[in-house]
Amino acid sequence: GGRAQAWAGQGELRGAETMSDSQNNAGLWHTDVERLRGRDPYDALAGRRVPEWVRSHARLRQVAIQLRKRMPIEMGGLLGVEPFVMAKTVGCALAAAARYGDSDAIPALTGALEATAGSLGGGAFGYEFDVQTRWAFYPAGSPNLIATVFVARGLAAAGVASGAPSLVTEAARSAEFVRNSLHAAAPRPYYRYTLTSERLVHNANFLGAGLVAMTATLGGQDASTAPAMSAATAAALTSIEAQRGDGSWPYGADAFLGWSDNFHTAYNLDGLLQVWLATGDDRVRTSLDRGVRHWQADFFGPEGEPKYYPSRPLPYDIHSAGTAIDVAARLASWGWDTGELAERVAAWTERHLVDPASGATYFQKRHNRTDKRHFVRWGDAHLALGRASLALLREGRRDPLEVAVARSSGVLPDAD
């Protein structure tokens, strides 16, 4: 508690009087819990009309999810999917509130988080529907690393920005869950995506390492946090070793997971940034530099359009766009030359993937049409993160959680 109070003021935002027009443009999305309710491109198996013979076979589950995602019409109602609030969405809203200095929104958001089906207890979070990918099945009510990290970071950011150490303690519980339940030690250390899969997925590993390192650093630089710091760094180095000569990473370690896309690359960079801020490790910084150069050079068009793959740009996806704005803006705040990229992607996104009347996001843009389906977690939540990070960058400020971590680690001297 004492440590938390000591750093809480360091990261605190200055309050409502400093909010820029960027927040007004964001429509104060994070302040209205009802706006967090919606459907998801991967929620097909939440549909009450999906028959058991589909649910009982892995391949059919995957087909159902992919059809729902790819059909350019909203099938949620036909499938019987009721709009719902996702834990990860609330985590993003908490982080956005922290960046805007909007402490008043935090109690309602933490209440909404507790009410989600993805809030599983013990610091673990998951998705509210069954997910079948080409490499894993994780049912509703099972923890996964991505949801856990985004919620935990939202809680930690809200705790730092509002001076509420209990929220940082909740984030530390999530990090403890990742450390104890998702850590694989052999043949090399890494953090697993789910409890049941042994696949090494690099973006999950980097984000898990970032969460563990971040919360350990906030806990103080002493013998009690040394094992967590060491484990996080070792896990990050496992995926750093998988970085290719051009600075890219495959999605995962298996041969059939060799693709590289925009938003998972951004997740890699985000996780690496957190590890570097928490440790100052030169090996992490070198890998991050290489990854940023590749991402900047190969994943964006001249107007800021976010390519899906370097060699196959379409579709331009709102998740790629929002994540790119967020990560590029935060990298720029720490000295990387990505500020202009964040601005270009933001301008392109507002023109092409945001409804000008409601502010709701569109799913994807293709050559001759825009898929205007609205998915809150996939689109609104990540664009809210991007808008909030860009607002801070324009004001010459940094993410309050990242400031607290960097000050605790010594990466950012107290005088800065």
Predicted regions and their residues:
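Glycan-recognition and catalytic cores of secretory/periplasmic carbohydrate-active enzymes
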Residues: A6-D416
